[in-house]
A protein has these predicted regions:
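Beta1/beta-strand and adjacent pyrophosphate-binding region of the FAD-binding site
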Residues: 182-194
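Glycine-rich loop(s) and the adjacent beta-strand/alpha-helix scaffold that form part
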Residues: 203-206, 210, 217-231, 423, ...
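A glycine-rich dinucleotide-binding beta-alpha-beta segment and adjacent secondary-structure elements
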Residues: 377-381, 392-399, 436-438, 580-591, ...
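Conserved redox-cofactor binding core of oxidoreductases
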Residues: 237-238, 244-252, 263-268, 290-295, ...
C-alpha cells in the first residue's frame, strides 16, 4: 500500500469514528437531524481529512455549520437539506450503504461526483468546512485551534481586552455623551462620521460653529474588539461587525454581462466600508500616504486617454500639503520616508518613528536595493510610541479589517471626534440614517431629514450641509435628494453625480520560499517602493508596491500555488507546507476614471427605511488592467530577487470598481458641466451644500486614499470657514 493510499484509508477509519461520535454525542441540533449531521461530518472529513491532525469533521465543522444555518447561512438551509439527502441517495444507489460507513475510496468517489454534478451544494460544504477548520474557534469549528497548531501560529485569546489609556490630553471617546433627538437649527449638519466628516465636525466646532454630526452606525470601543478571522471588515464571511448589517442594507450590483445581483454588506460586490463612528478608519490597515505631485495633474502629465474621463484636479499638491501635515500630526502617523526619492516635498517629518522590521521586511529590503529600487518604511496611522494619550501598537496579526484592542491604531473615532465633542459645540447622533437633503423654494439647503435610532423620521435644520458618507453613499444621498428645482438630485444638473466611480485594482504576486517568511509580527505590511508609481514606459501612472498585511490562515485557503487541489489531503498538506513560507507583494493600481463606472439609484430595491439603494455598474478601463499586469511583473521580479523559489501573479480583474478605496463620484472641478463640486468642495449649483470625502477625488492615485481624504477634510473645512466668515452662508 503506498503512502497516499495509507493516509486516505487511515483517514476514512478516523472519519467514520468522527461521524459516529458526532451522532452519539450531539442529539439536539439547531437545524440538522442526527442522520444529516452524521453524513455532513463524513463529508467534511473528506474535504479536510484527518492525518496527524484532526479533520474538519472532528474539529467541529458540523457544529459550526449547524450553528450558522440558524444565523448567517440561513439562506443555504434548503441547499444543505437537498444536498445531504442526495449524498445519501447516491451512496445507497451505488453501494447500498450509508455514506458515513463507506471506505475512503468510495466516499471520495461520491464526493467527486457531487463536485461535478451538484456544485452549488458541494462548494458550500467545501467553503464552510474550510471556514470552520481555519477560522476562529469561537464559532464552534477549529476545536482546540487545531489548524493554527498545525500551521505553527500562536493561539491567542479570542476576545479583546480593555484598553489601558496612557495619560494624555485627548478625550476618551467612550465617556462622550451620544444624543439622538433633534435639536434647534444649527450652523452645520455633517452627515457621516468617518475620515472626512469627523475632521470637518472638529474643525467647525473648534471655530465656534454649532454642529450636529449624524452617523448611521454606532460608536464602537476597543472593548468591542473580537479577534475573529471570519467576522471582520476585511473577511466578512460571517458578517461585518462594524456595519452595516446585512439585513435591510442591500445594494444592487450589475455584472459586466448585465446580470444583476442584490449584494449584502458582507459580500465583496457590496464595496463595503465600515458604517460606524470613525467609518473605515476604525478598522483600516492605517497606511497613511500622501499622493505624489503628478497624481493631481494626470491629464497634464499623460494627455487624454480614449474612453476615460482622465483630468487634472483643480487644486494642486501644494494646496493640500499643509493639510497633509496637519492630518499626520493630529491623527498621528509613524514612519520614515527619507529613503524615498520619489516623495512629494514635505515641510515637516512624521511625528513618530517607524515600527521595527519584521521577517518579510528583512528579506525584501535588501533584495529591492540589489535591484536598484528604493525601499522605505510605510507611513502608518499607528502609534509606534505613546502618542496623544494612547499607547503603542502591540504588533498583533489582527490589524487590517479589525479595530485595535489597545487603541493604538488612529482614526477619527479616537482623535478628532472626541475633540469636536469636547468643545461643547458638536453633538453626535448615532444610529441615524439620513434620508435626504431638504431645500427651499430657492433651491438652497435647509437641513436634512433622517431616521433616528428608534426609526422615527426627524428633521435637522442647518445653515449648511456637509456630506461625508464615502463616495458611494454620498452619491446616493445626493441622488435621493430630488425636488422641483433639483429633479435629478442635488448637484446633478449635468448628470455627473455618481459617475467616475473608482477604487483600486490590487495586483501583485505571491512567492514561495524555502525558508519561513512568517514570524507573527504584525501588522505585516511595513516596507514599500514607489519606483513604479510613475515613469513606466507606455503607461499612465502605476502603483506603490508593498509587502502585504499578515495573511490569516483563512486567507491562505484560496491562495496556494496554482495546481494545488481545492480540497482533500493534498490541500491540507499544501497549507502546512506553504503557509509560513509564503510572501505577497502587491499594490493599489491607479485606475483610469470612466463616466460609465457609476452609482445610480435603483428603481426597485429599497433599504430597511424605504430609501432607494445604490446601484453599482460599469467596468475597469483596459489601461487600468494593463497597468495592473505590469505591476504583477514588477512584484514578481522583487520576490524572485528575494529568494522566492516559485511565484505566480495576482492579475487584475474586470468589473465594477469601488471597494474600500471608493472615490470619484462627486468629482471636484471648475466646470459645472463636467464636475459636481468646485475647488472649495461646494456643490456648483447649491452654495450651502458641501461634499468632503473621497467622492471629490478626480483621480485616486496609486496609494491608499485615506490620508488624502483627511487632508481634503481639513482643506474643505478651511474653505467652508472662509466662506462662512466672508460672504455669509447664514440663511
Amino acid at each position: 500500500m503506498n503512502r497516499r493510499r495509507f493516509i486516505e484509508t487511515s483517514a476514512a477509519a478516523v472519519a467514520a469514528l468522527s461521524a459516529a461520535s458526532c451522532s452519539r454525542t450531539r442529539t439536539k441540533w439547531r437545524f440538522l437531524t442526527d442522520d444529516e449531521a452524521e453524513t455532513l461530518a463524513a463529508l467534511c472529513d473528506q474535504i479536510v481529512p484527518p492525518d496527524d491532525f484532526a479533520g474538519a469533521g472532528q474539529a467541529g465543522a458540523v457544529e459550526f455549520i449547524d450553528r450558522q444555518l440558524m444565523r448567517h447561512y440561513r439562506k443555504h438551509r434548503a441547499t444543505y437539506r437537498r444536498g445531504l439527502a442526495e449524498t445519501e441517495r447516491r451512496s445507497a444507489a451505488r453501494f447500498g450503504r450509508a455514506f458515513a460507513g463507506l471506505s475512503a475510496d468510495l466516499r471520495l468517489e461520491i464526493a467527486h461526483s457531487l463536485e461535478r454534478e451538484q456544485p452549488a451544494f458541494f462548494n458550500l460544504v467545501l467553503n464552510h468546512s474550510m471556514q470552520s477548520f481555519y477560522g476562529s474557534p469561537r464559532h464552534g469549528g477549529n476545536r482546540d485551534a487545531v489548524s493554527w497548531r498545525m500551521l505553527g501560529v500562536p493561539d491567542p485569546p479570542v476576545r479583546g481586552r480593555s484598553t489601558d489609556y496612557v495619560k494624555g490630553d485627548t478625550v476618551s471617546p467612550h465617556a462622550a455623551p451620544v444624543a439622538s433627538a433633534p435639536s434647534k437649527k444649527v450652523n452645520a449638519v455633517v452627515v457621516g462620521a468617518g475620515a472626512g466628516g469627523g475632521i470637518v465636525a472638529k474643525e467647525l466646532a473648534e471655530a465656534g460653529l454649532s454642529v450636529v454630526l449624524l452617523e448611521r452606525g454606532q460608536w464602537n470601543t476597543p472593548n468591542d474588539c473580537r479577534k475573529d478571522d471570519l467576522r471582520n471588515q476585511r473577511t466578512s464571511l460571517l458578517g461585518a461587525p462594524f456595519g452595516p448589517a446585512d439585513e435591510g442594507n442591500p445594494r444592487v450590483f450589475v455584472w459586466i454581462d448585465g446580470h444583476e445581483q442584490i449584494a449584502l454588506p458582507s459580500e465583496g460586490a457590496y464595496s463595503n466600508n465600515a458604517a460606524c463612528v470613525g467609518g473605515g478608519t476604525l478598522s483600516w490597515g492605517a497606511q497613511a500616504w500622501r499622493y505624489m505631485e503628478k497624481d493631481f495633474r494626470m491629464r497634464s502629465t499623460y494627455g487624454a486617454l480614449e474612453g476615460s474621463t482622465l483630468e487634472d484636479w483643480p487644486i494642486s499638491y501644494q494646496d493640500l500639503e499643509p493639510f497633509y501635515e496637519k492630518a499626520e500630526w493630529e491623527i498621528g502617523v509613524s514612519g520614515d520616508d527619507a529613503a524615498n526619492p520619489f516623495k512629494a516635498p514635505r515641510k515637516r517629518p512624521l511625528p513618530m518613528p517607524p515600527l521595527s522590521p519584521n521577517r518579510e521586511y528583512e528579506v525584501l529590503q535588501p533584495a529591492a536595493k540589489r535591484l536598484g529600487l528604493h525601499p522605505f518604511d510605510i507611513p502608518m496611522a499607528r502609534n509606534s510610541v505613546a502618542y496623544n494619550g494612547r499607547g503603542p501598537c502591540m504588533r498583533c496579526r489582527w490589524c487590517v479589517g479589525f479595530a485595535c484592542e489597545v487603541d493604538a491604531k488612529n482614526g477619527t473615532q479616537n482623535t478628532v471626534i472626541p475633540r469636536a465633542l469636547a468643545t461643547g459645540n458638536c453633538e453626535l447622533r448615532t444610529g441615524c440614517m439620513t434620508r435626504e437633503i431638504l431645500s427651499d423654494d430657492r433651491g438652497r439647503a435647509t437641513g436634512v431629514s433622517y431616521y433616528d435610532a428608534d426609526g422615527r423620521l426627524q428633521t435637522q435644520l442647518a445653515d449648511f450641509v456637509v456630506v461625508s458618507c464615502a463616495a458611494i453613499e454620498s452619491a446616493r444621498l445626493l441622488l435621493n435628494s430630488s425636488t422641483r428645482l433639483h429633479p435629478r438630485g442635488i448637484g446633478n444638473r449635468y448628470d455627473w453625480v455618481g459617475r467616475n466611480l473608482q477604487g483600486h485594482t490590487y495586483t501583485g504576486a505571491v512567492g514561495i520560499f524555502d525558508f519561513d517568511m512568517y514570524d507573527d509580527v504584525g501588522p505585516g505590511a511595513g516596507l514599500a517602493i514607489c519606483d513604479f508609481n510613475h515613469g513606466n514606459p507606455g503607461l499612465k501612472g502605476g502603483a506603490m508596491l508593498a509587502n502585504e498585511f499578515i495573511r490569516l490562515p483563512i486567507h491562505a485557503v484560496n491562495g496556494l500555488p496554482p495546481g494545488t487541489p481545492r480540497w482533500g489531503i493534498g490541500h491540507k498538506q499544501a497549507m502546512r507546507a506553504y503557509y509560513k513560507r509564503t510572501a505577497v507583494v502587491m499594490g493599489p493600481t491607479q485606475e483610469m476614471p470612466m463616466a460609465d463606472s457609476r452609482v445610480q439609484i435603483d428603481p426597485r430595491v429599497r433599504d430597511r427605511w424605504g430609501i432607494p439603494v445604490a446601484r453599482l455598474s460599469g467596468d475597469r478601463h483596459p489601461h487600468t488592467l494593463e497597468i495592473g499586469r505590469a505591476m504583477c511583473e514588477k512584484a514578481t521580479m522583487w520576490l524572485k530577487e528575494a529568494g522566492a523559489v516559485r511565484t505566480w501573479p495576482m492579475p487584475p480583474g474586470r468589473g465594477v470598481s469601488g471597494g474600500q478605496h471608493q472615490a470619484g463620484t462627486c468629482r471636484m472641478g471648475d466646470d459645472p458641466k463636467s464636475s459636481v463640486v468646485n475647488r472649495h468642495c461646494q456643490i456648483h449649483d447649491v452654495d450651502n451644500v458641501f461634499v468632503v470625502d473621497g467622492g471629490v477625488h478626480v483621480t485616486n492615485g496609486g496609494f491608499n486614499p485615506a490620508l488624502t481624504i483627511m487632508a481634503v477634510g481639513y482643506y474643505g473645512s478651511a474653505e467652508i470657514l472662509k466662506m462662512w466668515r466672508g460672504t455669509g452662508m447664514r440663511s
